[in-house]
Amino acid sequence: VSGSLSATKPSGLTRKQQALLDREQELIAIAFEVVKREGFTGLTMDKVAAASSYSKGTVYNHFTSKEDLIAALATKALSQEIAMFKRASAFKGNNREKLLAVHVAYALFCCLEPALSNCVLSCRTPAVTEKSSEKRLAAMNSLEAELLSLGDQIMELGAARGEVDMSGSIPATSIVFANWAMGFGANALFNSASESGAVVRVQETCENPILDCINLLLDGVGWKPLSTEFNYQETWQRVLDEIFPEEAAFIRQSKSL
């Protein structure tokens, strides 16, 4: 489950184009392993070349810089997120449950791929974007737009069915952004700052702190059914059991080692 960087290959490629694509995917996979071991600061073009059967010049033929390589990793991360979010949005339940399923998917992704989940934000810093190729930035923008559209669709369905009232002063874009911000921040803290006093305290007193954060947010905008009227912990477990059983089992096994 973890570490998969496979990509859907476009059809109709020539043999040479396919070979170039395969080589690029191989180099991205090598870069991913370097990042997992040493973090983004440890990633260099020299290390990628040394771990491959290609010269540094060949690596530069595919990526204009280390930052361009980080952007390529980010497109892989976004592609994996989208695949998991699409599976989650097919969950059979009301639209708040579907949104919760997306949050479950993101929590799983962050546990399975901590390096890639951090890459999505790192790739948007000026230090990276200023040295990334236009092709790579365009790919990231396209994937981000696809991610946002998934959130927008759930919002629209919730409003159409009267589950959430969008006639107030808070626009749907703000609610979608708040969900992303809360999900990213909470998962980053639990995965990267687990020794923090605030994290330790909330884990000792709450069964599912991330779910509590989601409920605070969605109850705050009045998304029905409210958490006082519905068992969303049960929904969380159903998502794990019905949509992501393999990923959930992998994480449980990893934590028990």
Regions found by a protein language model. Name each.
Residues 88-92, 124-128, 190-197:
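Secondary-structure edge/capping motif, primarily at the C-terminal ends of alpha-helices
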Residues 100-126, 146-153, 179-184:
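Helical hydrophobic small-molecule/effector-binding pocket
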Residues 1-38, 42-51, 68-71:
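Basic, helix-initiating cap at the start of DNA-binding domains
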